[in-house]
């Protein structure tokens, strides 16, 4: 459904998450200089969507949905639960220019923890190799699931309205999609 308007921040989040509507840099520049953008169709002559600082709050809590199917989920299971382990892990990955997206940490048993994250599929093998070198001798297990898809739901106020997550999870359930990781931000 076409929106009459959307905020810079919502459009920037959609662009960053893979919506192929506007380049995220163009939205950043428009926001920086307070320039309204109008996204138009090249196929039909109709009013487009205005990207601006403050959007008229329509009744829709969900402003957009994106998908990224070029994703790998990597998990390190059973790593020692000591200060600095996450720093070491993500520093090694950053040194190899591997961009990390969603991060999930859970406390394991017997003084261990598990960390899972997503990255581009093209970096999965290198990331696994780095992590096996780093944690393999400590008894941790590194796993990689690819391909996986990341679905992002964008909207202002989603956390303050009960039932929004339930509806989204219900739609995934109806489509037969199993959820591997969940992350929220607002």
What are these regions (language model features)?
Residues 1-185:
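C-terminal catalytic "cap/lid" subdomain
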């Amino acid at each position: 459904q076409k929106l009459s308007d959307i905020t810079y921040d919502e459009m920037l989040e959609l662009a960053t998450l893979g919506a192929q509507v506007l380049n995220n840099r163009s939205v950043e520049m428009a926001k920086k200089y307070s320039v309204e953008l109008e996204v138009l169709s090249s196929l039909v002559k109709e009013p487009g969507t205005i990207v601006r600082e403050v959007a008229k709050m329509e009744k829709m809590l969900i402003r957009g949905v994106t998908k990224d199917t070029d994703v790998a989920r990597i998990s390190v299971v059973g790593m020692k639960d000591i200060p600095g382990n996450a720093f070491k892990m993500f520093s090694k990955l950053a040194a190899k220019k591997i961009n990390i997206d969603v991060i999930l940490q859970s406390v394991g048993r017997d003084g261990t923890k598990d960390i899972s994250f997503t990255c581009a599929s093209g970096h999965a093998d290198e990331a696994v190799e780095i992590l096996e070198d780093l944690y393999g001798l400590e008894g941790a297990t590194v796993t990689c699931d690819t391909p996986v898809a990341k679905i992002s739901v964008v909207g202002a106020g989603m956390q303050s309205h009960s039932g929004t997550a339930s509806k989204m999870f219900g739609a995934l359930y109806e489509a037969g999609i199993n959820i591997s990781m969940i992350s929220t931000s607002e």
